Amino acid sequence: MQMLPTPLPRTGSALVASVPATAGARRVTLKLTMRYEMQCGWPGAGPLVVSLPAAMRVVPHSITRAAVSLDGKPPATVSVTGRVIVFTLPPRRGVTCMEIGPGALTVVFAPAAGIGNPAKAGTYRIAVRIGAHSFTARLTV
């Protein structure tokens, strides 16, 4: 009996945490981690789009590259339209392998990004998209 390879389903998960995690907190550190299949640990060409819920604040209405890290490095560009934040990822460098496997992309918004928690305690959805991958993370404050 011949065993044929079974393609893996496109799956992924996203987690989010805010420090402090209290309702109404201003200028929080917001950490998003997306886990999905990557080629050689590379998250993909992007763009990375993060859509914050209407209850969250982004003040000022722009975010500097220094106020955000993607896996510990600044994004190539950051743009903000309302509560939608779009990142261009730095270009991939070096040799590309052909291995597809589980990986993680972590986005950290520093307090300087000006993101504030919702005023009311509850659970809020943050939508994230990169390439063909879409995620929903739930922030509880």
Regions found by a protein language model. Name each.
Residues 1-141:
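Ser/Thr/Pro/Gly-rich, low-complexity intrinsically disordered stalk/linker tracts of secreted
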